[in-house]
């Protein structure tokens, strides 16, 4: 990375507040010496967290007194929060002063501000949220994850094109694409899914592999999984909930009695490695595909390492010219 990359950060977004964002930012800057950050938020809080850091010279802090609430409607945020940390962070990218924006704040508001300030490519009605998920064969990309609750067949085809472009950046030469559906039979699915499948089969640049069911999502049989935002968001959050339940119930079982505690001492190192490999923080940082510049959504409840990974995702997307590649595919 020879050219310095400038990231714009909404430091007030997310559940943990600005201190976690600053700690993650400092760790990120140590890993990526050719980057600099501009953070928007409460100046006093940001300055206190940055004070004494060896990376302070590569961090610009800008005061904003307004924040976007987690439950605020997107329309309200557009009308009333134009001085917020989120708006200012997105605006810095829209005006070309920064290369990418990262926020862990309100997804709907962030998407609306991205569309308003950065704009989508011609023909793209709404961006799609896309991120990698761990699978038995490495990882797959899934989109949309909540930006578009109801999608036309044409939108699903657009998602397939954009997801394929992102997958190619990560080394998938001819990425396979599947539609998430209630069955693998050609006759099953809603009208929009069946129409999208027909269009994808005939499309010259989509390597369509048919349908994938929910239980096959983590088998890694395809590179890109396409669905509407309602299905995608529910599937992702159910998966996170099941994973958390399994981990907590297993820990409880291993503490249940003395025999289990002894067994736990034996298997604990293996379990730690397994949990670390599939930790959602490793895959944090969702791309908002279809915008003319790079905008990355961090999970609001992520930890320090997770937010750091969202910053890494932003750098990867800028370095690979993702928006330009998306435009070429549409």
UniProtKB/Swiss-Prot annotation:
Pathway stated in the Swiss-Prot or TrEMBL entry: Lipid metabolism; phospholipid metabolism
EC numbers on record: 2.3.1.274
Cited InterPro entries: FA_synthesis, Phospholipid_synth_PlsX-like
Compartment(s): Cytoplasm
GO molecular function terms noted in the UniProt entry: phosphate:acyl-[acyl carrier protein] acyltransferase activity
Keywords assigned: Cytoplasm, Lipid biosynthesis, Lipid metabolism, Phospholipid biosynthesis, Phospholipid metabolism, Transferase
Pfam families registered for this protein in UniProt: FA_synthesis (PF02504)
Subunit relationships: Homodimer. Probably interacts with PlsY.
PANTHER family found in the cross-reference section: FATTY ACID/PHOSPHOLIPID SYNTHESIS PROTEIN PLSX, PHOSPHATE ACYLTRANSFERASE
Protein name: Phosphate acyltransferase
Organism field: Teredinibacter turnerae (strain ATCC 39867 / T7901)
């Amino acid at each position: 990375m020879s050219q310095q990359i400038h990231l714009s950060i909404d430091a007030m977004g997310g559940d943990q507040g600005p201190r976690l964002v600053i700690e993650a930012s400092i760790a990120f800057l140590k890993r990526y010496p050719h980057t600099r950050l501009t953070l928007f938020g409460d100046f006093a809080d940001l300055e206190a967290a940055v004070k004494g850091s060896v990376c302070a010279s590569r961090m610009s802090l800008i005061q904003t007194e307004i924040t976007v609430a987690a439950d605020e409607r997107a329309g309200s945020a557009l009308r009333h929060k134009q001085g917020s940390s989120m708006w200012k962070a997105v605006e810095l990218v829209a005006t070309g002063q920064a290369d990418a924006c990262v926020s862990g704040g309100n997804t709907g508001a962030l998407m609306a501000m991205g569309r308003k300030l950065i704009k989508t490519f011609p023909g793209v009605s709404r961006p799609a949220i896309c991120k990698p998920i761990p699978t038995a064969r490495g990882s797959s990309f899934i989109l949309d994850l909540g930006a578009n609750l109801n999608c036309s067949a044409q939108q699903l085809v657009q998602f397939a094109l954009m997801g394929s472009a992102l997958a190619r950046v990560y080394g998938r030469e001819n990425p396979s694409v599947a539609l998430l559906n209630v069955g693998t039979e050609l006759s099953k699915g809603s009208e929009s899914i069946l129409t999208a499948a027909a269009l994808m089969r005939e499309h010259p640049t989509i390597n369509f592999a048919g349908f994938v069911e929910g239980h096959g999502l983590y088998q890694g049989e395809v590179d890109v999984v396409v669905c509407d935002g309602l299905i995608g968001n529910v599937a992702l959050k159910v998966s996170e909930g099941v994973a958390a339940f399994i981990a907590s119930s297993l820990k409880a079982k291993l503490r249940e009695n003395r025999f289990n505690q002894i067994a736990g001492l034996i298997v604990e190192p293996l379990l730690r490695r397994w949990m670390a490999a599939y930790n959602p923080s490793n895959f944090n940082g969702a791309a908002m595909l279809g915008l003319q510049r790079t905008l990355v959504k961090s999970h609001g409840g992520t930890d320090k390492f997770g937010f750091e990974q969202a910053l890494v995702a932003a750098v990867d997307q800028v370095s690979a010219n993702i928006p330009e590649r998306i435009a070429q595919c549409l």
